[in-house]
């Protein structure tokens, strides 16, 4: 059973939330495209923007020169929605968003498959993934109709 993460736009804060898809979604396809995704600039990303990857549903920005702003992907491995690389992932994404790292598509795939997934499976920590909030991303990969409700309205 694969752990699924999805991003949802929080319009109140104009940010994307990266969060696990609820248990009720397991075993069913995530709504939304898994093929080529539309992009604001068709020249910014190749039409097959990484469709060969085993990680499905990566956002368009994952393959742009600016780097991924947030991620929604399906793991090919059996995992629960726990994270022990919770400090590494935001740092990598933030550096990519700032353009500080020129990760290729192959490097990006290797990071998830060999580093993040390995840490999840082997280190055995049980830190629950709540949400990653990464500002500035306008690639709206919403795979659930429900609004992002991680921020209490005060």
UniProtKB/Swiss-Prot annotation:
The lineage of its organism: Viruses, Riboviria, Pararnavirae, Artverviricota, Revtraviricetes. One of its GO terms (cellular component) is host cell nucleus. The keyword Transcription applies. Residues 68-117 are annotated as: Mitochondrial targeting sequence. May form homodimer. May interact with host CEBPA, CFLAR, CREB1, DDB1, E4F1, HBXIP, HSPD1/HSP60, NFKBIA, POLR2E and SMAD4. Interacts with host SMC5-SMC6 complex and induces its degradation. Interacts with host TRPC4AP; leading to prevent ubiquitination of TRPC4AP. Interacts with host PLSCR1; this interaction promotes ubiquitination and degradation of HBx and impairs HBx-mediated cell proliferation. Signal peptide: none annotated. Transmembrane segments: none annotated. Belongs to the orthohepadnavirus protein X family. It holds the Pfam family X. This is Protein X. Multifunctional protein that plays a role in silencing host antiviral defenses and promoting viral transcription. Does not seem to be essential for HBV infection. May be directly involved in development of cirrhosis and liver cancer (hepatocellular carcinoma). Most of cytosolic activities involve modulation of cytosolic calcium. The effect on apoptosis is controversial depending on the cell types in which the studies have been conducted. May induce apoptosis by localizing in mitochondria and causing loss of mitochondrial membrane potential.
């Amino acid at each position: 059973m694969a752990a699924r993460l999805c991003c949802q736009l929080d319009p109140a804060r104009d940010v994307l939330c990266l969060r696990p898809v609820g248990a009720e979604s397991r075993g069913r396809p995530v709504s939304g495209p898994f093929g080529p995704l539309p992009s604001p600039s068709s020249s910014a990303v190749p039409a097959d923007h990484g469709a060969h990857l085993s990680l499905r549903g990566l956002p368009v920005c994952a393959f742009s020169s600016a780097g991924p702003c947030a991620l929604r992907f399906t793991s090919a491995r059996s995992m629960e929605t726990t994270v022990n690389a919770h400090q590494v992932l935001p740092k990598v994404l933030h550096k990519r968003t700032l353009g500080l790292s020129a990760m290729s598509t192959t490097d990006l795939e290797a990071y998830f498959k060999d580093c993040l997934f390995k840490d999840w499976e082997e280190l055995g920590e049980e830190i629950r993934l709540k949400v990653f909030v990464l500002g500035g991303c306008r690639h709206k990969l919403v795979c659930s109709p429900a609004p992002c409700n991680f921020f209490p309205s005060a």
